[in-house]
Amino acid sequence: MGNKESRYLEMCSEEAWLNIPNIFKCIFIRKLFYNKWLKYQEKKLKKSLKLLSFYHPKKDFVGIRDMLQMAPGGSYFITDNMTEEFLMLVVKHPEDGSAEFTKLCLKGSCIVIDGYYYDNLHIFISETPDIYKYPLIRYDR
């Protein structure tokens, strides 16, 4: 058990712990371990996102627009940091130069793109042949 669990168990005496019904003990312990598992899955997903060479522009929309004007047509992952608040897939059309933005959401070990859940970003990339990485500003932290 980690520090958090041991602190909770230290706070209640052994006698008090023995008097708690087993069903509540199970719920308590499952919740602690499930939360740890979710955090582990999110860390694992964030690591795989970093390996895909994300790009981070300035933190405003003007920075994104300026960066995309110089880029050729294609698809780009853009983020200002590795948080759920700002993680996008941008598709720039080569003919007219317009861009479509899709916000991505992290849900545990899955990434949600246009309402579809992907367990692995490599699956999404293999299903989308026009995605490639163009070294605008690399995410290297």
From Swiss-Prot:
Top-level taxon of the source organism: Viruses
Induction trigger: Expressed in the early phase of the viral replicative cycle.
Keywords noted in UniProt: Early protein
Protein family (similarity comment): Belongs to the asfivirus MGF 100 family.
Function of the protein: Plays a role in virus cell tropism, and may be required for efficient virus replication in macrophages.
Protein known as: Protein MGF 100-2L
Classification of source organism: Viruses, Varidnaviria, Bamfordvirae, Nucleocytoviricota, Pokkesviricetes
